[in-house]
C-alpha cells in the first residue's frame, strides 16, 4: 500500500531548550527515532522545521535571543547549518539522511 507523505512541523518550542537559546538534543533523538519508525513502515515524511535562530544563538555563544530582526537573521544564518547537522547526527543511526529544500512562492 502506497502512503501519502506526512508533513511534520517541528517548532522552536519543541526543538529548543527552554528559553530558545540552544537545541534539545534529547528531543531531536526522540523525534528522529519517530521519523525512522514511520519511514520503516513505508510512510514518507516531510519535516518543516524551525529552531535555526535557537541553534545560532548557541553557536554564537549569546546569552539570549536577539530581539531585533538583523540579530535574528544573523542567528538563523549561522544556526541553519547547525540545525541540519543535528538532523544528520540523529537520523544517521537509523540509516536515514536529511535533505534541505528551499521553497519559493511558486512552490506553494
Where are these regions (language model features)?
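Nucleotide/pyrophosphate-binding catalytic subdomain
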Residues: 1-108
Amino acid at each position: 500500500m502506497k502512503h501519502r507523505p506526512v508533513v511534520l512541523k517541528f517548532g522552536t518550542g519543541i526543538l529548543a531548550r527552554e528559553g530558545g537559546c540552544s537545541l534539545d538534543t534529547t528531543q531531536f533523538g526522540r523525534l528522529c527515532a519517530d521519523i525512522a519508525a514511520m519511514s520503516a513502515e513505508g510512510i514518507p515524511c516531510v519535516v518543516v522545521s524551525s529552531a535555526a535562530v535557537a541553534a545560532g544563538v548557541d553557536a554564537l555563544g549569546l546569552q539570549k535571543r536577539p530581539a531585533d530582526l538583523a540579530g535574528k537573521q544573523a542567528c538563523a544564518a549561522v544556526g541553519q547549518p547547525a540545525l541540519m547537522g543535528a538532523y544528520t547526527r540523529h537520523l544517521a543511526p537509523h540509516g536515514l539522511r536529511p535533505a534541505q529544500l528551499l521553497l519559493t512562492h511558486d512552490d506553494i
